[in-house]
Amino acid sequence: NVWRFPYLCQKNGGGAYLVPYLVLLIIIGIPLFFLELAVGQRIRRGSIGVWHYVCPRLGGIGFSSCIVCLFVGLYYNVIIGWSIFYFFKSFQYPLPWSECPVSRNGTVAVVEAECEKSSATTYFWYREALDISNSISESGGLNWKMTLCLLVAWRIVGMAVVKGIQSSGKVMYFSSLFPYVVLACFLVRGLLLRGAIDGILHMFTPKLDKMLDPQVWRDAATQIF
């Protein structure tokens, strides 16, 4: 949510996106959240057992929700792997994605043409982090750096599952407060950049015509769930 919400806000009309988001949050998001808490506290069963208790024929809903959670876990753990990769790369100075790579041909320094046409961050993302092939017909080799980061991410998940819910309670104070510290650092850094005020005005200036676009409401509903 932290990295996706600003992107959706900028994509879907800035401040105008907050209107469908808040409407759907009040009408759908918060009621479903409290309904889930109430049902779980009253019946005291898991996702599958709750629906089987309500009606045995509805047990498939519980299985479906577990499958959805599985796919969501696979999707987000890849993002965690990317984050781990960038975490270790960020200890370098200068940052590897701050400048285009330069190759030397004798005494002549040549900037990578592909990077020069796009940007240093885009080049690093596609060529260093993802290590994608030149075309879809080429499968490419194993990206061992990203594979190791993904294994580390799944190792963390495995340790959390084995230790149980009590282990997560021990780090709850850190995990709940540290993201806000990081966001505060990002806020200060963003405000110190050149053109920060123009960017903020562009992001939060409402584009009311966007509210008539069904895709905006769809993105808002997806963000809530």
Curated annotation (Swiss-Prot):
Record key words, sorted: Amino-acid transport, Cell projection, Cytoplasmic vesicle, Glycoprotein, Ion transport, Membrane, Neurotransmitter transport, Sodium, Sodium transport, Symport, Synapse, Transmembrane, Transmembrane helix, Transport
Catalytic activity: L-proline(in) + Na(+)(in) = L-proline(out) + Na(+)(out); L-leucine(in) + Na(+)(in) = L-leucine(out) + Na(+)(out); glycine(in) + Na(+)(in) = glycine(out) + Na(+)(out); L-alanine(in) + Na(+)(in) = L-alanine(out) + Na(+)(out)
Topological domains, Extracellular: 81-143
Matching Pfam families: SNF (PF00209)
Glycosylation sites: 105
GO molecular function terms listed in the Swiss-Prot or TrEMBL record: symporter activity
Regions crossing the membrane: 1-8, 16-35, 60-80, 144-162, 171-188, 224-225
UniProt-annotated location(s): Cytoplasmic vesicle, Secretory vesicle, Synaptic vesicle membrane; Postsynapse; Presynapse
Signal sequence segment: none
Predominant subcellular localization, coarse grouping: membrane
UniProt record, GO biological process: alanine transport; glycine transport; L-leucine transport; neurotransmitter transport; neutral amino acid transport; proline transport; sodium ion transmembrane transport
InterPro entries: Na/ntran_symport (IPR000175), SNS_sf (IPR037272)
Membrane topology field: Multi-pass membrane protein
Highest taxon listed in the record's lineage: Eukaryota
GO cellular component: cell projection; membrane; postsynapse; synaptic vesicle; synaptic vesicle membrane
Coiled-coil annotated spans: none
Function: Synaptic vesicle transporter with apparent selectivity for neutral amino acids. The transport is sodium-coupled but chloride-independent, likely driven by the proton electrochemical gradient generated by vacuolar H(+)-ATPase in an overall electrogenic mechanism. May contribute to the synaptic uptake of neurotransmitter precursors in a process coupled in part to vesicle exocytosis.
Family per similarity comment: Belongs to the sodium:neurotransmitter symporter (SNF) (TC 2.A.22) family.
Stated name of the protein: Sodium-dependent neutral amino acid transporter SLC6A17
Organism of origin: Bos taurus
